[in-house]
Amino acid sequence: RVFIGTLRRHRQTAEALFDGAGWSLPCEEDAGLNEYDFHALFAALGSEHESLKASAHGDRHVFYRGLKQVLQLWSEDRLGGVAPETWNQFVERVDRARQRIARCGGQRVLVVSSGGPIAVFARQALQAPASAAIALNMQLRNASFCQYFFNRDAFHLASFNSVPHLDLVSRPNSITYG
């Protein structure tokens, strides 16, 4: 079975995978696999975080540092403004998607999602704090894959952020980040 978020990039990624593998599989969409709205999180920063707001428009290094701080504030419910969803609502949304996927029994499942939900999955498997999800999210590579072993009662991380299909001497610039 294949589960994807409802974002256009999720469908595009699934289609590219299917084209490359010669597969033709139906996709089950689940909004629980969608990324958080990082633009809205920056916009929700209160006046006490004005300098941090500017990092949303900086170069990628400035943006990365700013996003990491914004995610930490979000996870602590300290943005200062109103976000589309709280950190806890985001985690609960992702967890509902994970529980739906876990009901697939012994089937192999492909999930196409985004960095935030992927990091939350890993955090849940590791039973780690919110700060771990943020740290994991910030190191995810584009087009990486993670592998989990799961059933209705257990959820275990087997590999994280793997890119053997990109980590080639002949393609030194193929590994990119968010």
Placement of each model-derived feature along the sequence:
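Phosphate-coordination/substrate-recognition cap region in phosphate-metabolizing enzymes
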Residues: 1-68
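Acidic, His/Gly-rich catalytic cores of divalent-metal-dependent hydrolytic chemistry
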Residues: 155-178
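Surface-exposed cleft-lining segments at the edges of enzyme active sites
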Residues: 75-91
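Active-site-adjacent alpha-helix immediately C-terminal to a catalytic or transition-state-stabilizing loop
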Residues: 11, 24, 92-154
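Short aromatic-enriched loop/helix-cap "lid" or pocket-rim segments at secondary-structure transitions
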Residues: 38-44, 123, 168-173
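Short, basic/glycine-rich phosphate-binding loops at helix/coil junctions
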Residues: 63-80
